[in-house]
Amino acid sequence: MDPKTPIETVAETVATLIMEGKVLGFGLCEVNADTIRRAHAVCPLTAVQSEYHVMHRAVEFSGVLDVCAELGIGFVPYSPLNRGFLGGAINEFTRFDPSNDNRQ
């Protein structure tokens, strides 16, 4: 999404595509509670996706989960195992590609 384009404009475009039968639903990723409300007011959101796991719980405190529950929007957690760290895929022997090091 172009950050210079108002979310309402995006939602209007998606609503048109839904009415034309070209799109089944409207979802957003990594947005704040205000953006969710603004978009949902124009075109009902089906789902919101954000990073959420025991080490990254920002959506609990930012109002994202609350607004999704209030408006009946599905929430899809991204990286529930923290990109493999919580599942044991990453340990002290893991070697990272310097050109794609996500530890930063």
Sequence positions of predicted segments:
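Beta/alpha (TIM)-barrel catalytic core signal, keyed to glycine-rich beta->alpha loops juxtaposed to Asp/Glu
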Residues: 2-104
